Amino acid sequence: MLENYKNLATVGYQLFKPSLISWLEQEESRTVQRGDFQASEWKVQLKTKELALQQDVLGEPTSSGIQMIGSHNGGEVSDVKQCGDVSSEHSCLKTHVRTQNSENTFECYLYGVDFLTLHKKTSTGEQRSVFSQCGKAFSLNPDVVCQRTCTGEKAFDCSDSGKSFINHSHLQGHLRTHNGESLHEWKECGRGFIHSTDLAVRIQTHRSEKPYKCKECGKGFRYSAYLNIHMGTHTGDNPYECKECGKAFTRSCQLTQHRKTHTGEKPYKCKDCGRAFTVSSCLSQHMKIHVGEKPYECKECGIAFTRSSQLTEHLKTHTAKDPFECKICGKSFRNSSCLSDHFRIHTGIKPYKCKDCGKAFTQNSDLTKHARTHSGERPYECKECGKAFARSSRLSEHTRTHTGEKPFECVKCGKAFAISSNLSGHLRIHTGEKPFECLECGKAFTHSSSLNNHMRTHSAKKPFTCMECGKAFKFPTCVNLHMRIHTGEKPYKCKQCGKSFSYSNSFQLHERTHTGEKPYECKECGKAFSSSSSFRNHERRHADERLSA
């Protein structure tokens, strides 16, 4: 059924495949309903109105219509009125009115005058070429047409990107992606498209219904094949399994994309910031960050997002409970992927392994972040001071040191924080919770980082060394802070007097000289202090006084 379509694509014709296939299927089903060709008459009329979708796509009307009238009684044949050609079999119905040459080989006629030229060559008896590798016959030179399909040769190269194509028309279509040319515009939304097939798909999203409904969740689909794929999410049928980590998927394309997480392949690169992606759709979504486009808006609170998935996640914040619950510990999550990632904590599975040091991770995103510790890559740069970060979240936190923004506020005491994790740790002061316990001495802490720091007190090791002077430290944060001595960096600037500081605690102490804040108060005499060190020195004086008395 698709042989003729493939021949057209080979010689450079860009066709709308979904419409073509659906037309063939409809005609085939009608033929079966009519019964045997030997016992019945048939009549088909293809009018311009039936080709309305093609007219919408190409922007111009097709031929005025193709009318075929005939009957099949013994040796009678079908007469194609459009060109007077005679077909020896009724398969022209299934192949969009094929034309015939003396050797009973057929070519597609439906998609316009250009291909009629090829048909005329067959009608006049012009010598046809047969490609020996597959046996297919063409009016054109087989070295130009069929050989490229069978051997995979791509003779047309793009000078900008180096990408290769089988024929010249495909190269021409690709070149439009570089200059941004949009030849086909959809009037309903004003959006432009490079290829007519892309426009046709867009028209379907606007016009077509979704007749195939899932009985489990009610979700609708345009094609039955999409519904069958979707059903795998309910039945748990994941036939496509990754040989590296064992993760299974409902679609082969999902497995193909997943494999890139193991190979590290990221062929789609952003021209603005250089960030690379494994999937083209992720690059398209990323580009919205640069243009500031946020088409998905929450009707509840008005917050807009660049991705529909982000809006879906956000909408769950308006509901009372996260729908996906872990059966082992009872923790709830907003989506199934987060639950799957969490479940690896209980199973201990860490499928993502670092090629440099062998460290394994439960999530691919954690491996990506870890890999930057080896490569030194810091793609996220602060526009204010030029400081670069390995993670976008770290850049967001850093920018708040310039703006002074503290969006996370404690409901108990009103204290605000620039980072959400700091608020979470602060809340444990009110609850008294200390979930992180040292296995060596039993001491408990409110933060995991505090426990990690404490664990190094049991060891004399100082694994983190300054590259400038060789000084060793127990903690990586201490190295980063120490480096400011060599670089002279002072990222914390006072808005009142303009003075700058290398460290946040020095900056906070300085701010109190302007505000007059003295949060540390002595319970014995009521005297208050702006710094904890001054407060501790004062307490020691009271202790000495009690001893001397």
Swiss-Prot record:
GO CC annotations, alphabetized: nucleus
Zinc finger feature spans (C2H2-type): 156-178, 184-206, 212-234, 240-262, 268-290, 296-318, 324-346, 352-374, 380-402, 408-430, 436-458, 464-486, 492-514, 520-542
UniProt-annotated location(s): Nucleus
Pfam families: zf-C2H2
Annotated KRAB domain residues: 1-42
Entry keywords, A to Z: DNA-binding, Metal-binding, Nucleus, Repeat, Transcription, Transcription regulation, Zinc, Zinc-finger
InterPro entries hit by this protein: C2H2-ZF_domain, KRAB, Znf_C2H2_sf, Znf_C2H2_type
Function (record text): May be involved in transcriptional regulation.
UniProt record similarity statement: Belongs to the krueppel C2H2-type zinc-finger protein family.
Name of the molecule in the record: Zinc finger protein 266
Underlying gene: ZNF266
